[in-house]
Amino acid sequence: MRHQLRVPKLGRPADQRKAILRGLTTQLIREGRVTTTKAKAKALRNEAERMITLAKEGTLAARRRAIGYIYDKKLVHQLFEKAQDRYGDREGGYTRIVRTVPRRGDNAEMAIIELV
């Protein structure tokens, strides 16, 4: 039973939802910003902040957990090198969500999620 579990379902089965969030997280870390729907941006925020927190931790175990989640291994190493300098003084709040115009085809609420 799912009593009071607040996981955004995104209208997909669990395996597809996990794959989408992994891909979006990888893209966000690589590019610095991603344009997607508002619901996906809110779900992506949790995953991206978790990866940045792991990178700030900097341990071997944290690096291995990040490699298991992010698709690009080189990107993980870059993230771990830069995270402490970039986010060392922050305790969370590594991303920003900005709402944009609705998507033309289906009028879905769109948003830009970017790294601060």
Curated annotation (Swiss-Prot):
UniProt subunit comment: Part of the 50S ribosomal subunit. Contacts protein L32.
The UniProt record lists the keyword Cell membrane: no
Keywords assigned by UniProt, alphabetized: Ribonucleoprotein, Ribosomal protein
This protein's GO CC annotations: cytosolic large ribosomal subunit
Organism in which the protein naturally occurs: Prochlorococcus marinus (strain MIT 9211)
Record-annotated disulphide pairs: none
GO molecular function, one term: structural constituent of ribosome
Keyword Metal-binding appears in the UniProt entry: no
Protein name per its UniProtKB record: Large ribosomal subunit protein bL17
One BP annotation, GO: translation
InterPro entries attached to this UniProt entry: Ribosomal_bL17, Ribosomal_bL17_sf
Protein family according to the UniProt entry: Belongs to the bacterial ribosomal protein bL17 family.
